[in-house]
Amino acid sequence: IVRNYDVDGIHLDDYFYPGTDFNDTETFARYGADFNSIDDWRRDNVNTLIASLDETLHTLDPELSFGVSPAGIWANKSENSRGSDTHGQSSYSELYCDSLEWIRRGTVDYICPQLYWAIGYKAADFETLVRWWQKAVSTSDVALYIGLGAYRSAEAQEGDVWYGTAELERQLALLDDSIDIQGEVYFSYASLERVAGCPAMLTA
């Protein structure tokens, strides 16, 4: 793509491992001797992929922007002291993505966590996660964009917190008052067109 098209960046979604049980024990036995566990080996595989892409892409185009949109919860505090005060699927332990390591190494230009939950949602509060990710990038040169779950508003029924534009407006107001956030990304733009009032909200 980079060799043949004048693109500004390359963006990856989050699913590097499937998040379900699968058998790679034979491969681990063959290649994982330097690791204490299969989990560490899997995370290193993903880290190696990200670092390799970063190096290759910037060799082809030093001005290109490379980033990833990981699942919104790196890890829950209950399983990892560096994690967020949440209770959801852990990218670190279930998808084997160590996005904090990518930030530490600088192997991404930006990170765009998928924060597809409402403000005040008990298991994964939007504001709690925004603040966690702000801290995660605070001592790095990695730009932070927040992924917003516009699809939830498109699918919501009357009475749901996501119905209409109110929740998205609350989230945008919170982000506007936050530092170290370069912008937001909607999943998906097509969803916005299905939410009454969204076009007017975005151009206001």
Annotate each predicted stretch with a short phrase:
Residues 1-107, 116-117:
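Polysaccharide-binding and catalytic clefts of secreted carbohydrate-active enzymes
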Residues 22, 78, 123-124, 129-132, ...:
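Short, surface-exposed, charged/polar-biased interaction segments
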Residues 25-26, 81-83, 126-128, 199-201:
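Short, glycine/charged-enriched secondary-structure capping and boundary segments
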Residues 38-66, 71, 122-154, 204:
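P-loop/Walker A phosphate-binding loop and immediately adjacent motor/lid segment at beta-alpha junctions
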Residues 46, 92, 126, 164-165:
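A conditional alpha-helix N-cap/helix-loop micro-motif detector
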Residues 96-122, 133-204:
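Substrate-binding cleft of secreted/luminal carbohydrate-active enzymes
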